[in-house]
Amino acid sequence: MKRYHLSAGFVVIFVLLFSSCKPEFSETSRYQIAFYNLENLFDTIDTRDVRDTEFTPGSEKQWNSGKYERKVANMARVIKDVGEAEDFEAPSVVGLCEMENRDVLEDLVGTPALDDYGYRIVHENSPDRRGIDVALIYRPDLFKMDDYRAVPLIIEDESGERIYTRHQLLVSGRLGGEEIHFIVNHWPSRYGGEEQSRPFRKAAARLSRSIVDSIRSEKPDAHIIVMGDLNDDPDNASVKDILKAGVGPQSAESDSLYNALAPLFFQGKGTLCYRDVWNMFDQLILTPGLLKKEKGKLFFEKAGILDHEYLRQQEGDYDGYPFRTFVGDWYHGGYSDHFPSYVVLKR
């Protein structure tokens, strides 16, 4: 019987060649991009220079490790269920808001529900006085990040004092090998009244629009998804006039964007409810290049909201509303005061 002797050098070359055959991205023809407002995912530690004392054990909320761990597990369950609602194991990319820091994000992606997917985190602490941030998590088998930056939103009150709020997070990379950009937002709230706070959201819209225009000035057909809790609806001026997010599909050359959640809003659906009126604050807005159906290229397939029964209040004055963690200082033990929203892309 012949014996074959392989040199060490040959073995190394063989291993390198074999490993190079492994695809950079998992093979799939569909991708899900989601957004979720986590409704105050805070740890239990009183952090210096951050107004987070209400989420500590000695506060009126009596926030503690048990409640925190339940909250993290709840958020992870919802994120996984967003994927399963569209026959994914878990979403490809998820934009997030209302979390305190990177530590809580590490706990989130390390839960049993999400740990298998190896989610990576894009996050920077924002200057928001409450300490709440925006972030993006992604599956590295489906998305490869090339770069990111936090773009500050500079706004001032009537006396000229700066209002410290969330930045906008721009994350650029390749989804299934195709270049794409995500802009994760949490625009200023309606605290103090919708009309009085309106200029701040218009300023946020101008910033988002300037980021989009900057990218498209170099690549007009760039794939961009603006996502976030905008604290405005699709028919508010900040969204439809300044951001130029239309309610109908746009031509590839159009200056307008496509608001993928707007059709659901005009059907009476929403991601949060206030005084029995549904709002669609949690939106995903696409550049027109994602509306072109070209073979082998990413394009928009559908949009949706995850509003399963377990995510809804089942009784009382708020029957049917999102089942939230707190109502004031009363611990409700639910999930979030927002439903998650998403889009599906395919090629």
Which residues does each PLM region occupy?
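Bacterial Sec-dependent N-terminal signal peptides
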Residues: 1-28
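N-terminal, active-site-proximal structural segment of metallo-dependent hydrolase catalytic domains
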Residues: 21-112, 122-134, 311-320, 346-347
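Metal-dependent phosphoester-hydrolase catalytic domains
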Residues: 21-23, 214-224, 232-347
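Active-site-proximal beta-strand/loop segments in catalytic clefts of secreted hydrolases
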Residues: 36-39, 97-100, 123-127, 139-140, ...
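Second-shell loop/turn segments in exported
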Residues: 57-68, 90-96, 123-124, 157-159, ...
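Structured beta-strand-rich core segments of catalytic domains in phosphoester-bond hydrolases
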Residues: 99-179, 185-187
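Extracytoplasmic/secreted cell-surface and envelope-processing proteins
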Residues: 103-106, 130-133, 191-194, 233-238, ...
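Extracytoplasmic, non-cytosolic globular domains
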Residues: 123, 169-264
